[in-house]
Regions:
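A short, proline-enriched helix->beta-strand linker immediately N-terminal to the Walker B motif
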Residues: 154-158
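Catalytic Walker B motif of ABC-type/P-loop ATPase nucleotide-binding domains
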Residues: 160-164
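Conserved ABC transporter NBD signature motif
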Residues: 60-71
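Short coil-to-helix segment of the ABC ATPase nucleotide-binding domain corresponding to the Q-loop/switch region
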Residues: 96-105
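Conserved ABC ATPase "signature" region
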Residues: 67, 113-131, 183-186
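ABC ATPase NBD coupling module
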Residues: 69-85, 108
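Conserved ABC ATPase signature
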Residues: 135-139, 143-145
């Protein structure tokens, strides 16, 4: 039986420099959440960008639902992968309101899934209902990050990639959002890869957690909390 998603012996490269060598890991079952833990600059974002198809690979392969999407001679275009990436930095359209930015996720998802996500539920869980009419320049970095997360969730991808998803969220509110995000991911059963430098976040959100150190994935273990 094939794994739902699998990386096989891939070197992840950015700017001509190898960030992570000969990396292999898998999401065995749809809906599992894997967290990759490591400090800034270790190559976590490069891993996500490569999985999303924004960077090519020269060795190994990446497979989703039994299909090769990246290898030395295969590179499925990003828009054809049904993978959604929420960047750490602000990726909102500045001239769209928060509401319109979020609804772009629904437009991308239109007709893709039989069961649609409850928009109100996502807005409530991420505490966005009171800022829908504001523009990106009028909201905080944490609110912008949660807006981007809502938009990405609404695309209902086969694979969700989250780059430091709560790094800009105010510390006084962060734990509550972690609880809500875990609930969302469990309810939606979206397979997810989260990269973070926050060990608590990694162990709380992930069903498995891997540690990246010295250009290698040192460990990928099942988490019991």
């Amino acid at each position: 039986m094939n794994n739902f998603f699998e990386v096989k012996n891939v070197d992840f490269v950015a700017g001509g420099k190898t960030k992570v060598r000969n990396m292999s890991f898998a999401i065995e079952n749809e809906g599992d959440v894997i967290c990759l833990l490591g400090p800034s600059g270790i190559g976590k974002t490069t891993i996500l960008r490569t999985i999303a198809g924004l960077q090519k690979i020269k060795n190994g392969s990446i497979e989703l639902k039994g299909k090769t999407i990246s290898s030395s001679d295969v590179n499925v275009e990003p828009e054809d992968r049904n993978i959604s990436l929420a960047f750490q930095e602000n990726s909102l359209f500045p001239h769209y309101t928060v509401e319109k930015n979020i609804l772009l996720g629904l437009e991308k998802n239109k007709g893709k899934k039989e069961k649609q996500i409850d928009l109100k539920e996502i807005l409530d869980l991420l505490d966005l209902s009171n800022i829908l009419k504001q523009y990106p320049h009028q909201i905080s970095a944490g609110e912008a990050q949660r807006t981007s997360l809502a938009r990405t969730l609404l695309t209902q991808p086969d694979l969700l990639l989250l780059d430091e998803p709560l790094s800009n969220v105010d510390q006084s509110f962060k734990e509550e959002i972690q609880i809500r995000l875990k609930k969302i991911l469990k309810n939606l059963k979206i397979s997810t890869i989260i990269v973070t430098h926050d060990s608590y976040e990694a162990f709380y959100l992930g069903s498995k957690c891997g540690i990246i150190f010295d250009q290698e994935l040192r460990q990928l273990s099942l988490i019991h909390i």
